[in-house]
Amino acid sequence: MLRAPKCSRCRNHGYLVPVKGHTGKCRWKQCICDKCYLITERQKIMAAQKVLRTQAAEEQVATVGTQGPQLPPRAPAAAATALSSSICPLPRAVPGGVGPGPTATCFLERPPQAPSPGPSTFQLGPSGRPGPSTFQPGPGAPGGLRDRSSAWLPQLMPQAPRPELCYPDQHLPVRPVPVPGPVRPVPRLPFADYGHPLRFKSDHVVGAGNPEREPFKQCPACVPVSPYQSFPLSEGQDSSSALGVPQQRGFRHVSCSPYHRSGLVSEPARDLQPTYCSPPPPPPPPPPPPLPAPPPQPQQPHFLPPGYLSALHFLPPPPPPPSPPSFSLTYDTDKENTNDQDAEAPTEPSQDSPQEQSN
């Protein structure tokens, strides 16, 4: 039983293959047309490249396993150039302190980011005091403790990194580390201008004759503070106190000297000239916005000429509607009066006539 093949080349050529057994037995590979020939050559080249890549990977794994990891040829030079400014090698090992021993393997050490307080701060010597670290040369080695003055001995304070730690073979001049003195506070001027709204008179400024009012000579580290005396409510209250604004009457000084422990020293109250002003009145409210103009009314179209109705007042008024007929006794009386002048007539027919008409 034959069927159409699944591969495109055989199907395009019109080949028919059996139901089973077509895998790997395509007939287009034996075709001599140009397209089939190019496809066959390309498949052969790709298979050869795959074999070469596999062999190269196996050889590289075998080489690394026998010789160990190696850096590229330019990697050591670049690493040494980049780390030469911030990395120093360890000194040579001296076994037993007798002469220089064999050169040990040099490892690179990166210094800490912050300035180091010195190796002697973290290690203790035989006497229990901070001594030289293991990175310094021994006592018998050149540049040891015997060749250095007592001023160089480590102190309990931060020190800059020493160049002899990185280069122990070079003898550098020994310089004593200066010891900074205690920090002295800088005194400030009394009553500096800090933007306060009050202005003091000349007698309220700190004077030279009163030692109690000169705190900066006794305590130079104190910050100038000018406390004010609160306004007593029992004294007279004026309009300013009624408004809720206390008026400044005087001031007192609090001594910061440790020798005066008797408490607060109050001074007689003196009147000060307040320089503050009453708050400005609130701004007037903005005027209301003007009302929008009414929309213009549309003009009515004129269907009649303007002089058409001017002659209507000359027309006579319409006559009133006729009144309905009414029969009353007054009408009969007038009629009787007119008939009496000609001749007398019997009253019964005259009286019956309106009755007949009404009937």
Swiss-Prot record:
Residues 277-299, 315-325 have a biased composition (Pro residues). Brain. InterPro entries: DM_DNA-bd (IPR001275), DM_DNA-bd_sf (IPR036407), DMRT (IPR026607). It is found in: Nucleus. It comes from Mus musculus (Mouse). This is Doublesex- and mab-3-related transcription factor B1. Residues 7-54 bind DNA. Residues 348-359 have a biased composition (Polar residues). Residues 111-149, 262-359 are annotated as: Disordered. The keyword Transmembrane does not apply. GO terms for biological process: regulation of DNA-templated transcription. Keywords: DNA-binding, Metal-binding, Nucleus, Transcription, Transcription regulation, Zinc. Belongs to the DMRT family. One of its GO terms (cellular component) is nucleus. It holds the Pfam family DM. The gene is Dmrtb1. One of its GO terms (molecular function) is metal ion binding. The keyword Cell inner membrane does not apply.
